Design a protein with these regions (language model features):
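Internal alpha-helical scaffold of NAD(P)-dependent oxidoreductase catalytic cores
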Residues: 1-31, 44-81, 126, 130
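Short pre-catalytic strand/loop immediately N-terminal to key active-site residues, enriched for Gly-Thr
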Residues: 28-34, 86-91
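Aromatic-residue-lined binding/catalytic grooves and analogous aromatic/hydrophobic interfacial grooves
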Residues: 39
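Short, contiguous hydrophobic alpha-helices characteristic of membrane insertion segments
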Residues: 43-44, 94
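NAD(P)-dependent Rossmann-like dehydrogenase/reductase catalytic/cofactor-binding core
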Residues: 69-137
Length: 137
């Protein structure tokens, strides 16, 4: 159990680096690590993939990078500013029978959601193993 002073100090430190989410159960920390601690690498990997796909479709490397970065930044900003859940935002930018719908159908056919779930699960299991390895309770 942490004291109020300890909690306030932790909040000041962590808020300087980004978002702070308190969890009630200590065993949830492995999931937090899998989503938030490892999450930036997932986003960077998506940006890499978008860049590579853009270049494969004929864009120059600098164009591909700028578009991939701006797309991820803009979508993140919109999601942060909106009270709508991400699924609703996705629906709002997807025209039936359009280009986005075609891309999302490809993601779905390739098991995109399940792939992300497996990756996060693998990270959580590794976080747990590292905790045991390094003496966490």
């Amino acid at each position: 159990k942490t004291s109020t002073t300890q909690r306030q100090l932790a909040e000041r430190i962590l808020l300087a680096a980004g978002e702070l989410v308190w969890v009630d159960q200590e065993d949830a920390l492995d999931a937090v690590t899998a989503v938030s601690g490892s999450g930036p690498a997932y986003v960077f990997y998506l940006i890499e993939a978008l860049e590579e796909a853009a270049m494969a479709e004929g864009l120059l490397p600098n164009e591909a990078r700028r578009l991939a970065l701006a797309t991820c930044a803009g979508a993140s900003r919109l999601a942060l500013q909106s009270s709508e859940p991400p699924a609703r935002l996705r629906e709002q930018v997807t025209s039936k029978g359009g280009t986005t719908a075609a891309a999302l159908a490809s993601f779905k056919a390739d098991g995109f959601v399940e792939m992300v779930q497996r990756a996060v699960h693998s990270a959580r299991l590794r976080a747990r193993a590292m905790g045991e390895e390094y003496g966490a309770p």
